[in-house]
């Protein structure tokens, strides 16, 4: 296994050297036009002298339900969802660099129950590319996903489920990007490192998010502090992105990520599929429908049972949100 890992890392190094070494023929490749503002979620501020494109947006979605003597039943509720994103893009000759940050945080107050979190996501992305044809580039990407605040079980408030960097998922990959238009891109990497970090020792001891659980002593009980806090994987990775206007002021965006571990059940592919349907009402108001599907063969999720104790198992995870609110672009 170590020899396979060494071979994969060597392949990564060779691809990087190929990306960075000077190649005179590449100078003949026509420069791809600067990425227009429409290719991003938000409008961009362009510095034509330096080749930089920068932009971002903040959205605040709000919903409220109030019931009083409502015969059909139901529950009053109040929810707030904050969404922020920012990006920068640089292009000069055959070289390009992209960086982006996305933050989502939501709060829910159902009836007289305590305030709880219903969404929490922090994602950072960076990419370097070196173009060698009109539609193909060597590329290196780095992705980080985690959350900001602790998450506890609704029925057991003292039971911690996750927190900042517990987990954190890091993908480091090198490969080839195919980009025929500014609306679509496909990145394929045969050498990608996936790192799962569980920064909380209690969660690590429980084997949460696929890390190795704590060892057990002679009495059969877990030995505290022996759970591993890092899981390392090497495999193939695919990232496909699409941004397609459907009609005036209506845009569909999709991102599909697939990862296959070379050394452990490679047929069980990890899936992360994000979809967004965005409706622009006017300059400041917008509505959107978002749906995310996730499957990770190494992550066990809680399974509730009515007639027997709760268990944990592999499941397809799905999240859908509908929002209407204020949007500020910069």
Where are these regions (language model features)?
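Residues on the lipid-exposed face of transmembrane beta-strands in outer-membrane beta-barrel proteins
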Residues: 56, 60-62, 82-90, 124-130, ...
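Cleavable N-terminal export/targeting peptides
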Residues: 1-47
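Transmembrane beta-strand segments of Gram-negative outer membrane beta-barrel proteins
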Residues: 48-64, 95-97
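Extracellular loop and loop/strand-boundary signature of outer-membrane beta-barrel proteins
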Residues: 68-74, 109-114, 157-162, 219-228, ...
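Outer-membrane beta-barrel "beta-signal"
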Residues: 316-330
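Transmembrane beta-strands of outer-membrane beta-barrel pores
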Residues: 60-66, 92-94, 103-109, 144-150, ...
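Outer-membrane beta-barrel translocator domains and adjoining extracellular loop/strand segments
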Residues: 68-72, 111-115, 151-157, 198-205, ...
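Repeated loop/turn-to-beta-strand initiation elements of outer-membrane beta-barrel proteins
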Residues: 95-97, 135-138, 183-186, 249-252, ...
């Amino acid at each position: 296994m170590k020899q396979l890992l060494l071979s994969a890392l060597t392949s990564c190094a060779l691809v990087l050297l190929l990306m960075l070494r000077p190649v005179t023929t590449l100078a003949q490749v026509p420069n791809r036009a600067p990425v227009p503002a429409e290719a991003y979620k938000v409008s961009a501020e362009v510095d034509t002298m330096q080749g930089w494109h920068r932009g971002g947006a903040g959205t605040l979605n709000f919903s409220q339900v109030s019931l009083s003597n409502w015969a059909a039943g139901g529950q009053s509720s109040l929810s707030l969802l904050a969404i922020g994103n920012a990006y920068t893009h640089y292009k000069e000759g055959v070289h390009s660099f992209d960086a982006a940050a996305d933050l989502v945080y939501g709060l829910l107050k159902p009836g007289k129950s305590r305030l709880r979190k219903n969404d929490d996501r922090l994602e950072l992305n960076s990419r370097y590319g070196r173009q060698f044809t009109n539609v193909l580039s060597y590329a290196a990407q780095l992705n980080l996903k985690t959350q900001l605040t602790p998450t506890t079980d609704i029925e057991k408030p003292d039971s911690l489920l996750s927190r900042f960097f517990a987990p954190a998922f890091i993908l480091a990959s090198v490969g080839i990007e195919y980009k025929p238009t500014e609306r679509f891109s496909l990145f394929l990497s045969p050498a990608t490192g996936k790192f799962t970090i569980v920064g909380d020792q209690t969660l690590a001891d429980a084997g949460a998010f696929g890390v190795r659980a704590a060892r057990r002593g002679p009495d059969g009980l877990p030995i505290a502090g022996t759970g591993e806090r890092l899981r390392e994987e090497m495999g193939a990775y695919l990232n496909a992105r699409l941004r397609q206007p459907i009609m005036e002021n209506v845009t569909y965006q999709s991102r599909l990520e697939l990862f296959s571990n070379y050394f452990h059940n490679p047929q069980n592919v990890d899936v992360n599929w994000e979809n967004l349907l965005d409706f622009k009402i006017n300059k400041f108001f917008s509505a959107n429908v978002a749906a995310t599907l996730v499957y990770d063969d190494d992550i066990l999720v809680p399974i509730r049972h009515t007639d027997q104790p709760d268990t944990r198992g592999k499941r397809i995870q799905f999240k859908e949100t509908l929002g209407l609110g204020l949007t500020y672009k910069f």
